[in-house]
Amino acid sequence: MASSRVILALLLAAAAVMASSAQLDEKFYSNSCPSVEAVVRKEMVRALGAAPSLAGPLLRMHFHDCFVRGCDGSVLLDSAGNSTAEKDATPNQTLRGFGFVERVKAAVEKACPGTVSCADVLALMARDAVWLSKGPFWAVPLGRRDGRVSIANETDQLPPPTANFTELTQMFAAKNLDLKDLVVLSAGHTIGTSHCFSFTDRLYNFTGLDNAHDIDPTLELQYMARLRSKCTSLQDNTTLVEMDPGSFKTFDLGYFKNVAKRRGLFHSDGELLTNGFTRAYVQRHAGGGYKDEFFADFAASMVKMGGVEVLTGSQGEIRKKCNVVN
């Protein structure tokens, strides 16, 4: 009986996701703000030209937004009073680019006051971050509204880098995302960097023994040694490491090549090799011969994720500034 209730709940959640995402439209602003994509892209070209490493964080920010309360811009809200917002929760304390999101939103507000949501601005920025990193381009369905609530404790819905395969599949399924979405969106790790503390448990404390021999046995030894040379202790809270060594500013197939060799940075990356479907996908694209196929898959999964639990119509609001409600 309990399992039946769980299945019913998942089906109802999936139906709600599909209903809300169906209300999004690539041409939503064609009359009210036809220049919105050009305005966003102009700011993105300028910013990534000066700091190309910002692409990964912006993509990650959109992902973190969508997995908590849906793609409603709640990750952008500041904490207020006694209420701690998502951005100040532990999983989000390493997010960066909030100031740049505000700059882009200000440019959009200047062009079209009170028209385009922060959630839509962030979705467009994530798309352009990928495209300007030599990744795929896709049409972004628009029409999201901004949420008014942001709760730090709800960030437990975010898949942690330590997650095993069962945890990953459950967290993705809760957002109506399947195994293909899991392996495809994980490959967003082809751009960007990570702090050592997100993975040093694999190097020094995998089973809780906290000694030099307590390593993740699924991690390739030479790669492990290289990571140890950069992250010298569990207490390293500042060092940044490339997630896709050598091409962390380029959106390519490098992620799959690394994971196939057991050189995925996070434990969650390595877990993709424990399932037949995701392992086959990794191995197929590790060969480097199907870039267009992966790009199309990534675009499709980003559109699907971008429709998770969105607010539309008269729900929510259109924030004037992304860090505070109106």
Swiss-Prot record:
Annotated glycosylation sites: 82, 153, 164, 205, 237
UniProt KW Glycoprotein keyword: yes
Coiled-coil segments: none
InterPro entries: Haem_peroxidase (IPR002016), Haem_peroxidase_sf (IPR010255), Peroxidase_pln (IPR000823), Peroxidases_AS (IPR019794), Peroxidases_heam-ligand_BS (IPR019793), Secretory_peroxidase (IPR033905)
Cofactor annotation comment: Binds 2 calcium ions per subunit. Binds 1 heme b (iron(II)-protoporphyrin IX) group per subunit.
Active site, UniProt feature: 64
Reaction equation(s) it catalyzes: 2 a phenolic donor + H2O2 = 2 a phenolic radical donor + 2 H2O
A Pfam family it matches: peroxidase
Signal peptide span: 1-22
Binding site for heme b: 189
Domain of life: Eukaryota
GO cellular component, one term: extracellular region
Required cofactor(s): Ca(2+); heme b
Location of this chain's protein in the cell: Secreted
Cysteine pairings via disulfide bonds: 33-112, 66-71, 118-322, 196-231
EC assignment: 1.11.1.7
Residues at the site labelled Transition state stabilizer: 60
Binding, Ca(2+) 2: 190, 244, 247, 252
UniProt keywords, alphabetically: Calcium, Disulfide bond, Glycoprotein, Heme, Hydrogen peroxide, Iron, Metal-binding, Oxidoreductase, Peroxidase, Pyrrolidone carboxylic acid, Secreted, Signal
Modified residues (Pyrrolidone carboxylic acid): 23
GO MF annotations, alphabetized: heme binding; lactoperoxidase activity; metal ion binding; peroxidase activity
Residues engaged in binding substrate: 159
Protein family per UniProt: Belongs to the peroxidase family. Classical plant (class III) peroxidase subfamily.
Entry function: Removal of H(2)O(2), oxidation of toxic reductants, biosynthesis and degradation of lignin, suberization, auxin catabolism, response to environmental stresses such as wounding, pathogen attack and oxidative stress. These functions might be dependent on each isozyme/isoform in each plant tissue.
Name under which the protein is recorded: Peroxidase 1
Originating species: Oryza sativa subsp. japonica
Underlying gene: PRX74
